[in-house]
Structures are given as structure tokens and as C-alpha cells.
Amino acid sequence: MSDILKQICDVKVQEVAAAQKRMPFADMRRDAESRVLTRDFVGALRAKIAAGQAGVIAEIKKASPSKGVIREDFIPADIAQSYADGDGKGVSAACLSVLTDKQFFQGSVDYLKQARASCHLPVLRKDFMVDPYQIYESRAMGADCVLLIAACLDDAQMAEMEQIAHSLDMAVLVEVHDGAELDRALRLKTPLVGINNRNLRSFEVSIQTTLDLQKNVPADRLLVTESGIGSREDVKAMRDAGIHSFLVGEAFMRAKEPGEALAKLFA
């Protein structure tokens, strides 16, 4: 685990402890289990791909540790609606990803709630899961999918959190950065496997990471390439290789109209 990732995960452990003092585990679980049906995250991606389009998970992200503030004019509901509309001709996001980490990414649970309420798209809670409590918390706030980062968790933790998520009708996106993590991720049941092109130690980005690891991903899994997709050439390289699902944030967040930027990149 890289130094920054360890630092983030250590903070998450503290945040979970504080959250459980405000709302005990049993109460959070009860709240999560009482929520209405989720939106079909995997189905939304597959529907776009079946229609010959890219399945885009469009990210709502204000800032990051490596780049600082990415978008000053930050209104999550408007951004979400822009992604859902796209170019108005069918090229639009399949799903949303919303950063809820406050300390490192200037995210918020409220941003997720606002984004989800403003459109019909399924929503991924983008945060750093270190405890089962957070899975229940994610459903309680309205998330349709959770992110499990292999570098943050051991096999038993991933399996437990996946089981809880699936019991709540949530999808799971498991994120890997190298071959060893991919091997571990493939032991899970989820069809969603994300390959992050960002090296968590150097923060360098190379889309070759996805292309190199793709050959080890079974055909029945839905491979999502994450980070570093910023040009039509990047998209073409991935789609030519048979990769049709993308998680993109920064390239859209820097545009005046994020949805139009999405449509232009994936037209």
C-alpha cells in the first residue's frame, strides 16, 4: 500500500469509529435495509454497450490530493443532469461516480444525494472502504454501487463487503492496479472489475496498464478502465482492444459543460 493510500485508509478507520458513535452499527444496518430498490448499475453499463456505445461512468469530483481543486463551479445536481443529458442525441453517461471523501477529495455524502436526486442514473459511491459499516452507510445514503480497492483490503474483507453489498442489492466495482491484485479480485463474484491506470506510488498514469492486464480478465467480467482517458485516441485504443467501459472524471470536470465534453470524447 502506498503512503498516501495508507494515510487515507487510516483516516477512514477513524471516520468509521466516529460515525458509529453518531449512529450505531445496528441502526445503520436497519436504515440501509429499509431503503427502496436500487438502480441497476451493471445493467446500465451493459445496455449502453449492447447499443454499440461506450459504457461511461462519469465522475463528479471537486478535487484530488495530486491536482488540488479541479472544478471551482461545483454544483453536483447540475453536473449529474449534464452527464445524463450528454449531447441530447443518445451519447451520455451510463452511470455516475460521486466522491464522498471529505478530507482528501473535498467530497461529501450530500453531493451523492444531490446528484442521484437530479437524474435517473445509477450512482457509485467513490470512497475508501475499510469497514463493513461503510457498505450499509453507502446504501443508506442512496448509493447503487460501492468501490472496493484491492490495495486497501485483504481477501476476507473484500469477500465480506461484497456479500453485504449484494445482500442490499448493490453492485460492487473492485479496483486493481496490478496483476497480483487482479488475481485476488477475480475470486469475487462481482462482474465489475476496474483497472486503475494510475500508479498509486508515483501517481504516474499510463493506459497501457489496462491493455497489459486485460488478457487476464475472463470474458464474463465487465472490465472498466479508470484514469488517464483524456483523448479520442485513448478511447479508440481501448475500444479497439475490446474494452467498452470507462470511468472518467477529470477530463469532464475541467470542461464548462461536462456532459458535452463526455459526448465529444465518446462520439
Swiss-Prot record:
Pathway linked to the protein: Amino-acid biosynthesis; L-tryptophan biosynthesis; L-tryptophan from chorismate: step 4/5
GO molecular function: indole-3-glycerol-phosphate synthase activity; phosphoribosylanthranilate isomerase activity
GO BP, sorted A to Z: L-tryptophan biosynthetic process
Catalytic activities: 1-(2-carboxyphenylamino)-1-deoxy-D-ribulose 5-phosphate + H(+) = (1S,2R)-1-C-(indol-3-yl)glycerol 3-phosphate + CO2 + H2O
Entry keywords, A to Z: Amino-acid biosynthesis, Aromatic amino acid biosynthesis, Decarboxylase, Lyase, Tryptophan biosynthesis
Entry EC number(s): 4.1.1.48
Pfam families: IGPS
Annotated TM spans: none
Family: Belongs to the TrpC family.
Name of the protein in question: Indole-3-glycerol phosphate synthase
Organism: Delftia acidovorans (strain DSM 14801 / SPH-1)
